[in-house]
């Protein structure tokens, strides 16, 4: 009886350990997973790790998976997408932020004008400017700068050295390159002997913060999944180019060995199949989750963000018979490649707001309502947030006042007091 109980406890502990391992692997990015499997294969002679084809393509036949992982730096896009997911909860915000991220040059500067980004995203210039202000607060400071001067001014402000003289020199940085110290002194209205010290402060700044990240010729953020539009709808598959494999080397294990080292290796060998099974479960969960997202949001893929339908983590978890936290791990940091662009899986989720008819409308509709309402108001008598709430109710949308304020902020719209003051100043 006691022996049976002990065995049962051991089995329970083993199952719990395997479950935790599976959950940990599910939450890993492709790069983190490769690092984890490389470490396992390095410490266990019975395991063979095979890097994803995307990694092998970086180094050709002599590619060293261990060395590559050790030398790995996160890509600029991966770094930025992580911050986007933390900074924004609304899908429209994330999609707009992703548009900006796609416009980044290796230097970390924007490679497109604000006008072109706003046009491509289908938003107003004021909203694009509001989004840029948030993105320029990302780390490292200087990302999303529009040019060299913009980059250096952002960093000087953070370093608390942005005096009038420093800003003047930065905005006339061409004169520094030409060593025209006298002209710079005239612009700054200071002694020429003060200029070298100001230049020294500027030279401590980083003109190209994006270069601290990995810029291999492979995609900066390889998608984990691929969605294809066919005659009968959308289909989803795993991106095998980013899928690693791990196998047990039976030929390296010989029965009959009895020394302590061999017994220790036998125990390590027992963990081999667990890693392989966890990998399979990870791929299966990713694929099933993505299939539900694509099926539910096919109109979003076909027609754009305005056609998102309400969908939460709990909805997907219920359909798959999984816990919401498992779905959260599955979608965190994951990208899916469509025929036009790569999207984060979290872009497929959208919260709902109540309508007077008892149904639900996606929050994008409320966002658009606020934008249209403020855009069409009398400039001399701008609408208060309470007035917008009342108009929304008449239109069949139930939006809280604090939600209106949040949407205004998202759209880059000022308060009614500030809009009235701006109109009076014209």
Curated annotation (Swiss-Prot):
DNA-binding region: 312-331
An example Gene Ontology molecular-function term: DNA binding
Residue numbers covered by motif RPON box: 400-408
Keywords: DNA-binding, DNA-directed RNA polymerase, Nitrogen fixation, Nucleotidyltransferase, Sigma factor, Transcription, Transcription regulation, Transferase
Tree of life domain: Bacteria
Biological process annotations from GO: DNA-templated transcription initiation; nitrogen fixation
Family indicated by similarity: Belongs to the sigma-54 factor family.
UniProt function note: Sigma factors are initiation factors that promote the attachment of RNA polymerase to specific initiation sites and are then released. This sigma factor is responsible for the expression of the nitrogen fixation genes. The open complex (sigma-54 and core RNA polymerase) serves as the receptor for receipt of the melting signal from the remotely bound activator protein nifA for the expression of the nitrogen fixation proteins.
Protein name, UniProt field: RNA polymerase sigma-54 factor
Protein species of origin: Rhodobacter capsulatus
Gene (UniProt): rpoN
